[in-house]
Amino acid sequence: LENNNWWRLITPIFIHFSLSHLAFNALWIFVLGSKIEMLDGRFLFISLVIFTGIASNYIQHLWNGVSLFGGLSGVVYGLFGYCYLIELDLKQERYGLPPAIYIFMLVWLILGFLGILELFGFGSIANHAHLGGLISGLIFGMLTKLYSKKNI
């Protein structure tokens, strides 16, 4: 990042461009975050937010270069990726998310990349941050599983 402005990797999660943008992200952080924090601990939740926030913003920056973007959507996708991976081989739901929610988020991601959301007035969307968040959440989930198995 230009001139060693490393903080730009995390500060976009504090910027939102509309009240609905903030409300949508806050809702998912509350719903998913409270479940992850309760079941997996506060330290893991905070680490997950920081990891997915930095990763999603870095991917967005790599893909689009210097541009103005913000929001917690990359982190939200990271939380979904984490929950999905942790639940993948469990016999029962851990976080209580119905499969339709995961499908909805994937469809939303695809619609974003296709430009359909912008056509319907959702504004410019940091699609690569969403994808980066999803991938980094999956990675965090894999690392969490590996670490948990080694320490049992």
Q: Model segments located where?
A:
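A detector for small-residue-rich transmembrane helices and their helix-helix packing motifs
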Residues: 1-152
